[in-house]
Amino acid sequence: MKKFLSVALTALCFTSTAEAVYEAKSDTGTEIFDYIENRRREAREQKLTEEQEKLLADIAEAKERLPQEPKEGDPVPAVFEGDDMVYYSGSGEFIATGKVDIIQLDGYRFQSERAEGNVKEQVVRVEDKAHVLQLTPGAPRVTLDGYKTVYNYGKKTGTMGNAHGKAGEYYLTGKRFEFYPDHIVVYDGTQTKCGAKTPDYHLSAERMEIWPEQVIRMYNVKFWIKNRIVGTKEYEENQLGEKEKNHFPRVGYNSDHGAYIRDTIEIPIANHLSLDINAYVETKKGVRSNAELKYKNRDFRGWLKYGFYDDSDNRWIQKEPSLDLWYGRHFGKGIPLSYSVEAEVGHWRQRAISSTHQEYEVKLMHDPIILGKYALILNTGYKITKDNAKNVPNGETTVRGSNYSVILAREFDERFAAYVSFSYDKNNSRNSVFNFDVDDYSKKFQSGVSYWLTPKDRIVVGVKWNADQDKFDDIDYYWYHDLHCSQSIVRWRGKRKKLEVRWEFTPW
């Protein structure tokens, strides 16, 4: 099972929203490579482009040429350049033509072939194409190309028509952009993380808002695959840097269940409250879906769950229903630790076994300890599991015990990574009523390697060792292949001789 890895990856999620986990489905601990790949991807996204580096260099040079330092409260200085400039000192009007370049020293660049405006009013007007670059601390990095632009660089307000560009990792288009000091509004816009000229998927919205706290808010949203609408929603909110959201269907095949399709439909009910329909249909056993009434507010989560759930071994459980409450947070103030408390109580069913099931767990997780190319991840916890099954011998059970894991991962280079781990969990299939999300033993070693064969192809091998009985337990082989803006994953369960193939749009 992947229980101990989920604890470790929860710790990674506490450290940064940019490290939210895009999980591989693994039984041998290979999820740690998702953390490594997400971190590499984040580093690439945070790297400045050539034009962003040039803007910072030009700002630094312009500041050196200022006759005096601006006082607090003074307008932010701007620098104007062009092949030909005409300035009317009386009115403040100007006309600039040929490689017009306007830099505002707090991180803005405005470029066009012709611009008019008024220096006294601090207004720039461009009828034809204009290029805008925003690189201000704490705000999303924005690059836009559009038409019929009017911009007041003093008030930081303006408009742009028929524009396209990028905010953070999102590619945007819009019929009209409005600029305000603290946010950007897009009307009749689209957004996607797919950088293709014709993206495989995108979201459209009547109105989008891009806020400095790295948030995109969208209203009256449609979800598209190519040119077909696959869903609608009144409101959607994305965090820039978020990797875990995937709005689109996932399809696949495995030896146990045949071909299948998964999709998640989120229905907003009230502030912080939604109904999630996790739809799942397979060819062998039909519909196995679930529904969750979800509450999410800051560090607290709550779910009322009903339906079918599967683990990494394709074992299924029915929750009829189950209430799951979770609270977790980072200690902060220089303390590299996070903690969480979780309780789940409900009626569970697995084949002929049914029980009132209770789980209570507290976890303590250390932030990843980075030692050069090594990452050390430590966590521990204590869990109480109670069952009261009436239809099986010894169905009334209580299991109390600790769990912990130690994971050491190394990035040898941009292509090659490896890990080794040891974990202990008191809960296992021998002392549990339900054979779900637990191993057959308590102590295990896991290790694996990941290697990029080509820029689009990665192979992963993960192995698991039963340390209770000192015997080899499992081996998984993976082939990840990047397709445009989606990914296919082939998994071969070496010891079990089982195949699984998945295809899904990538959430980055």
Where are these regions (language model features)?
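Bacterial N-terminal signal peptides
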Residues: V7-T15
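Long, low-hydrophobicity, solvent-exposed regions enriched in small/turn-prone and acidic residues
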Residues: K2-L5, E19-R125, A130-T143, Y153-W508
